[in-house]
């Protein structure tokens, strides 16, 4: 991979804060931190457009005693076999379960699947976390 050197102008105070943070995190140099920021910026933009393939997790907490939530969750998971790769089910207590659903597909479709899962009656909380599949990252 060819590297290109470029310069930027930013306020000194902003650079000082940035340097403190990247040192705390453990970056060896600014270039690595800037590369990660640019990658993250590109990935988030691709999610907004919705046409790029992403990977991620949909994590939900639900009360398995409430209505038909278990059946509806399973039905939805079977409806999206191409996008849902795997699931992890954890019993939190006598009534509450945590489910981590690993997904891969077009960003727009993954967001729609997450919305459908999180809006089911009985789901107490849900969160979608998306990342790149790594294919297009440099």
UniProtKB/Swiss-Prot annotation:
Named cofactor requirement(s): Ni(2+)
Source species taxonomy: Archaea, Methanobacteriati, Methanobacteriota, Thermococci, Thermococcales
InterPro entries xref list: Acetolactate_synth/TF_NikR_C (IPR027271), ACT-like_dom_sf (IPR045865), Arc_rbn_hlx_hlx (IPR013321), CopG (IPR002145), CopG/NikR_regulator (IPR050192), Ni_resp_reg_NikR (IPR022988), Ribbon_hlx_hlx (IPR010985), TF_NikR_Ni-bd_C (IPR014864)
HAMAP family: NikR
Binding-site residues for Ni(2+), renumbered to this chain: 78, 89, 91, 97
Keyword Nucleus: no
Disulfide bonds: none
Entry keywords, A to Z: DNA-binding, Metal-binding, Nickel, Transcription, Transcription regulation
Cofactor mode of binding and number, as noted: Binds 1 nickel ion per subunit.
CDD domains named among the record's database cross-references: RHH_NikR_HicB-like
Family: Belongs to the transcriptional regulatory CopG/NikR family.
Gene3D superfamilies the record matches: ACT-like. Chain A, domain 2, Met repressor-like
Entry-linked PANTHER family: NICKEL-RESPONSIVE REGULATOR
Name of this protein: Putative nickel-responsive regulator
UniProt keyword annotation of Phosphoprotein present: no
Source organism superkingdom: Archaea
Any one GO BP annotation for this protein: response to nickel cation
